[in-house]
């Protein structure tokens, strides 16, 4: 009898030890890295939601798609006089360069989608959003600078490719249109977007933005 009790006790201890190992072997929930993220469609959804928070407001200084860059709207605070007096200071930390931070997040999702172990259709919408926002961001850069360096993967800070020369305007436009075509193919139509997700980019919205890009380039070419 004692032998049976001893065997049962040992088995229970081994079971508890196994459960404890499983319980303690958890991913940190307070700080996630790329290596432990992007394993479920929910991860991709949560990450893609961040694209919308990176959009610039109308008072941010990035107004490339708005009438604030035209002669329809002007400032009353005298900033234009700085140009005449030669007092305008060039700022190399302008918000324009922050667009590359947004492009990096787009590239991270696209890179992780390539190694996603599940059904690609589960994350198709979020991948399409990444393509759309990368096109949107490069169009902002195009409007400000013309040709810019094209970055398609999330480089580390010490990567020598970060100092690559700028690509031509035509190459940037080709990338924008290619990304928009991929976005259009995978985004849902507006009628199929749930009420809780209204405001997310739809297929119709991506088509409208592509039309804007084509019209903008038609005036330049």
Where are these regions (language model features)?
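Bacterial Sec-dependent N-terminal signal peptides
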Residues: 1-28
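Membrane-proximal, proline-rich intrinsically disordered regions
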Residues: 19-62
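Proline-centered turn/helix-capping motifs that create local helix->coil transitions or kinks
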Residues: 22-23, 59-63, 141-150
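Short linear capping/connector segments at secondary-structure termini
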Residues: 29-33, 84-88, 153-160
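Conserved, well-structured interaction surfaces
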Residues: 40-49, 53-57, 77-145, 161-174, ...
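TPR/Sel1-like alpha-solenoid repeat signature
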Residues: 131, 207-213
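Short coil/turn linking the two alpha-helices of tandem helical-hairpin repeats
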Residues: 142-143, 149, 191, 216-221
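Aromatic-lined, polymer-binding surfaces characteristic
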Residues: 147, 151, 197-206
């Amino acid at each position: 009898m004692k032998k049976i009790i001893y065997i049962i006790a040992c088995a229970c201890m081994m079971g508890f030890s196994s459960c404890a190992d499983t319980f303690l072997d958890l991913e940190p929930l307070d700080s996630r890295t790329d290596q432990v993220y992007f394993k479920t469609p929910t991860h991709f959804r949560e990450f893609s939601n961040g694209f919308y928070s990176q959009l610039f407001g109308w008072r941010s200084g990035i107004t490339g798609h708005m009438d604030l860059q035209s002669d329809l709207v002007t400032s009353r605070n005298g900033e234009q006089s700085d140009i005449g007096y030669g007092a305008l200071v060039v700022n190399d930390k302008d918000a324009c360069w922050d667009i590359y931070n947004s492009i990096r997040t787009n590239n991270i999702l696209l890179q992780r989608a390539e190694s996603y172990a599940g059904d690609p259709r589960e994350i198709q919408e979020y991948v399409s959003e990444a393509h759309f926002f990368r096109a949107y961001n490069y169009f902002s850069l195009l409007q400000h600078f013309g040709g810019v360096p094209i970055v398609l993967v999330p480089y580390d800070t010490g990567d020598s490719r970060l100092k690559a020369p700028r690509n031509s305007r035509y190459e940037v436009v080709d990338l924008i249109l290619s990304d928009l075509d991929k976005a259009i193919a995978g985004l849902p139509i507006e009628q199929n977007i749930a009420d809780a997700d209204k405001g997310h980019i739809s297929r119709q919205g991506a088509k409208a933005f592509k039309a804007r890009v084509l019209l903008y380039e038609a005036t330049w070419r």
